[in-house]
Amino acid sequence: MILQIIKLKSNLPEEELLKRAKEREPQFKAIPGLMQKYYTKSDQKGAYAGIYVWDSQESFQSFRDSDLAKSIPEAYELIEAPNIETLDILFQLRK
């Protein structure tokens, strides 16, 4: 399994950012291999993160190459390039 963390900064009001995230939710639910996605926010103004859990490297790579992934900066009107971190999950506590 793969854990992907996409940290982003946006000047959108939180309500608008959440509205856009909810509108895009069905597209993310339809992604093969995406086991879970967490929508999170930082204590810093305008700082958010999407935390993704992928079933395989192939699913993760397929998403990275997708139009949906490439649309993230525009959809949330990012003010700088997102910070993306990818980690291999060694094991999980609960299943």
Residues of each region from the PLM?
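A common structural junction motif
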Residues: 70-74
